[in-house]
């Protein structure tokens, strides 16, 4: 097992490798940069170059006023061109271009994750996903049909967005009307009955007005999985007034409907590290893996969601150097699902005979009926000016936000046991019925922030930012009385069994101060070194709207707990080489997280935990030649618990669901005017799994390589085809595993996708 956990370059120590990288990258980058420069009379002249479609030069968020190459943070921008070339139809697929980021966690116990359940640098980042800089709530899968680019920022983002995950954030930028007319359409077919169509129409009306319409429809089965299906439709109309003038108004609407059959995973029997949970079930030690096509749900399982988002943004250029923006957004995400998952402990196994083919496991029904809403108004001012000889690049603003969540209580669903090796899904437990035992959460936030980049000299910059959030969270929860099991309560006198009884009604208010500071020095016109330090906080219940009374021992969201706090240090270098077509970056980072809530041996919670994530990351994005494009990166990260209860299955202090080594690279080459070829590979190293007392489950997932390829053919200016092949060598791997380790999701096998792209 130890060899499986080692990346091929393990013999290089992290710090030695990074130091050599930073020292070595400078002369190499300088030599490459010189190709785009000419020298006359000792005057440096940089030739103009065409920006790479694989390396957007600027964040679309006005809070990041500097180019990506001059931002003192690790930032990856995944462009629309990369998304199209790879056929990435959802956010999770797009994030495969960022090393160490992915949906590695499959849920706790019988509960399973849904949607974009993203982990980044040792932390759950699924509640730190933003659209146009505004929080997007909901455990749904986000389609890319209306996405211009995806921006991934590693390290604390509390100064940028308020409460957020301690190790990073993800910002999806929506498509907007532009000042040219055109139509792009695509039709795709592929493995597992994949069918998808998209339409993108932009039409100019007059001199300063344009409308845009994006439409998407998709139906598919999950490749390699029986019964698992996905179906979604989306429409995104928008209109812009005043394009090319000092006053611009954008009106946007997004509607997405999804009807999916969720996947609760399959048993880990037969995986490396698995052993039977008891002596009486020892036959499972040599009975072999289950068929990865097996579906352990029921024909009644479903995952339905509806997203509606309306946005109005007004921009006014006060002068050539100063712009004020005001954005108002209302959004609602409703999700309703019934998902079946197996329970793999020894007490859950029934053995009618000695033949394991007759054995069954208990099933549990995971249910959710939730509505998330957000209403926000945000004003931002950006300005560039001088005070004496010092230049300023300022971004400041205020935000008013109300977020609400209602979890509707539903009556429990009872399911029969399922055969371990030959599951039968022809079970119809019926749909969900509400019982009135709801949980309601609401958070109101007022925030004010200011960022400034100071140009001290031609080569030296300082930057800093501060954000103050004043928040107020209210939460109430009810339980249907007279039930059984964990969390059950008795019915008060005169109250009928099954009636909702309020068990929690509390509130929490407070202030959060987040800040960041950095410095950057240009070694040459094209390269720099930088340092950065950032502080980010998240209060109890900050990611799920759930609170518990002060002093209550059985909740991690007590109102008397302090906010979680993350401190990140980063030192790095960025180089624009080859006529500024290619961006090379390298960074060394450390994040310390404190005020972590830990569960004690008796099941109560205390706040004394500390975690640390440290390592280095290198990346590349852009054009090596005008015809050769590339995006990729490598990270080595060590995530450990410095103080608190060890949560890894093997008893170590390692944080689970965090690969120590991760690599990704995608490259595309325009061989002729009409033919393009692309190929990519990614590596996810071995990961520790969490622990909840499960016996015999794997402590690790094994590392794996996956390769993809693409062939493109241009028929004429109006039509081109592309063939994408995923998992080219049909690698068998564990994509995600749940906390107990009884269930996992197998990686997608080799699949094909043929797309016709039309342009008018």
Predicted regions: what is each one?
Residues 587-592, 606-694, 729, 755-759:
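Gram-negative outer-membrane beta-barrel transporters
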Residues 146-148, 159-237, 243-248, 308, ...:
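Outer-membrane beta-barrel translocator/receptor signature
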Residues 683-692, 712-760:
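C-terminal beta-signal and adjacent terminal beta-strands/loops
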Residues 41-180, 571:
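Acidic, small-polar-rich N-terminal luminal/periplasmic segments of exported/outer-membrane proteins
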Residues 315-319, 323-329, 333-339, 530, ...:
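Membrane-embedded beta-barrel scaffold of Gram-negative outer-membrane proteins
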Residues 310-332, 363-478:
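Face-selective signature of the C-terminal outer-membrane beta-barrel domain
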Residues 218-223, 235-317, 335-372, 413-445, ...:
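Acidic/polar loop-and-plug regions of large Gram-negative outer-membrane beta-barrel proteins
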Residues 240-242, 372, 391-393, 399-403, ...:
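Structural signature of Gram-negative outer-membrane beta-barrels, strongest in the C-terminal barrel
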